[in-house]
């Protein structure tokens, strides 16, 4: 096991591993135990009691956080004609079709989100093997396959985040930066929490949310008391 740094050891001393904190306390403590020298990301991690192998328990979607994430997302849009013009007007960083396919096949990945109009999915499908593993493949469930490219681009730029349960039932979502006011982080937390509660599959049995923790990029995890909200 790797030896923890002195900074991490000091950070861990501030956290009671046997305690579950209120959302407000967890956010404040996550910021206080941040050991990174940069403006680290604050993240919420969920452990859900679901079986992702079942189609109706594959929790996935997107939500616009009221206070954004603190990160400027670079958006690539696959569209033609008027839709391409709409995407550019909405603030898309890159817009194209076959030319973008060639760039990506050549190893170009200077973007964070990919949006496509439905008619372009046959073209984008050629990139499934490279975009899929990176979580960049457009999907109707996250609003990234749409004719309303203006809305899609504007939402991403406004702080839209995607979430998807992994094979172990975990979901990780950024809720802002250490530099954010605590109130803004709490508001973002409440937004994603409400969305995930509403996404509970009707077939899920037992306690739906098994655990919630808040952490920073290199900080310790702080357990959240679900009875506090």
UniProtKB/Swiss-Prot annotation:
Question: Record's Gene3D superfamilies?
Answer: 3.30.190.20, 3.40.50.790
Which CDD domains did the record assign?
A: Ribosomal_L1
Q: List the disulfide bonds.
A: none
Q: How does it assemble?
A: Part of the 50S ribosomal subunit.
- Molecular function per GO: rRNA binding; structural constituent of ribosome; tRNA binding
Give the NCBIfam families listed for this entry. Answer: rplA_bact
Family of this protein? Belongs to the universal ribosomal protein uL1 family.
Protein name, UniProt field: Large ribosomal subunit protein uL1
* Keyword NAD recorded: no
Q: Which gene encodes it?
A: rplA
Q: Which HAMAP family match?
A: Ribosomal_uL1_B
- Asked if the Swiss-Prot or TrEMBL record annotates the protein with the keyword rRNA-binding, the reply is yes
Task: Report the record's Gene Ontology biological process terms.
Answer: regulation of translation; translation
InterPro entries in the cross-refs: Ribosom_uL1_bac-type (IPR005878), Ribosomal_uL1 (IPR002143), Ribosomal_uL1-like (IPR023674), Ribosomal_uL1/biogenesis (IPR028364), Ribosomal_uL1_3-a/b-sand (IPR016095), Ribosomal_uL1_CS (IPR023673)
Write out the entry's keywords from A to Z. Answer: Repressor, Ribonucleoprotein, Ribosomal protein, RNA-binding, rRNA-binding, Translation regulation, tRNA-binding
Its biological purpose is as follows: Binds directly to 23S rRNA. The L1 stalk is quite mobile in the ribosome, and is involved in E site tRNA release.
One cellular component term from this protein's GO annotations in UniProt:
large ribosomal subunit
